[in-house]
C-alpha cells in the first residue's frame, strides 16, 4: 500500500542531526535528541492520534493507541531509536531517486557514487524510489525509517477505524548506536505483552538472535628509559599491546567471520613506550563460547603478567548485552505473528541472526520479548546509506498487520 505522508515524514526526520555521543555522561547523550523528541516527535505523535503521549527522563517518547476491538486483548509495542551512528549527521541533504534505473547513482557533487558493482543490494531495487545521501553525510534511515514507519502506521489506523487492532504502545528512544539507550528503559511503564524494534534492514528481515556482547579495556604499563641504554631495562607498553593482540586467534576478526561465528575486534590503540591502552569488543552467539572468549583474554593477560614478573597488563571486562534468543525461545508468539503477517502480505520472512545488537537485546531481558523487524535501510552508518520507499511502505503494512492479527 502507498502512504502519502511517509516520504515527507522521513525526509523531515533525517534532516535533523541526532547523532549520539559515546563520550557523554548524560541521557540522552546529546541535546539534539531531546529537542527532536520534544519538538518534533511528541507533537506529531499527538497529531497522528496517539494518546497519553509523554517524554520520560530516560529519553523515551511514549504514546498509546487504545484497542478498538475488545476481542484483541494483546498489548503490542513498537520501538525505534532517534540517534544516528558515528558519522557526519549535520546538513543531511537526501536525494530522492524515482524509478531507479538500476545504474550508478551519483551522490550529489561529492564524487562518491552508489555503484551496483560495489553494492550488490542495488540489484533488488530497479523501478523503485530510493532515498540516498548526497555523499557528505549518512542518511539516518537507521533508524528514522523505523520512526517514520511506526508513525505512519498509527496515522493510518487512526484514519481507518474499520481496521480492528489491539492496544499499541509506541516508544522512540535515544542512544541505541552507542549501546546505552535501553539501559534505562522502563519496561513496567511500557507494559506490553511483547514488542518489536523496527530497526532492521532489507525487506522481510525478522530477527530474534543477537550477539552476546562485552567490551574489554586493557592498560599496559611500560618502563621508559633511553633507547641507547634500554637493554634489560626498557619495557615498551606498545610492544606489550602488540604481544597481547598477537595471542588472539588471527582469524577471529569481524572481516573474516560471518553467520554464527564470533570475534574479537580491536577498536582502538593509544599510547607510548611508558603506557598504552587498547579497546576491544567481544562478540559471540552461544553463551559458552561468549564466556570462553572473555576467559581467554583474561588468561592471556595473566600469562603475560606471570612472564613479566609484575602486573603490567590490566584487563577490565564489561558485559554489554546478551543474545535475546534465550528469552524469546521461551514463547515464540511474536515471531509466529510477524512471520504469519509477512507471509499473508506476500513477503518472504528472512529469519537470520543479527551480527550486532538492538535495543531489543536488553529489553527482552527486562521481561518484554522484543525481536526485530525490517525497516528498509541498506549500507547503514555512512555516506552510502540508502532506503527504498517501497520497502518502507511494506514495513508499515507489516506493523498494521501485526496489530490486527487474530491468530
Curated annotation (Swiss-Prot):
One of its GO terms (molecular function) is metallopeptidase activity. Zn(2+) 2 binds at residues 142, 177, 381. The active site is at residues 83, 176. Zn(2+) 1 binds at residues 81, 142, 199. It is found in: Cytoplasm. It comes from the Bacteria. Its main location: cytoplasm. PROSITE patterns: ARGE_DAPE_CPG2_1 (PS00758), ARGE_DAPE_CPG2_2 (PS00759). Pfam families: M20_dimer, Peptidase_M20. The keyword Metal-binding applies. One of its GO terms (cellular component) is cytosol. Binds 2 Zn(2+) ions per subunit. Belongs to the peptidase M20B family. This is Peptidase T. It comes from Streptococcus pneumoniae (strain CGSP14).
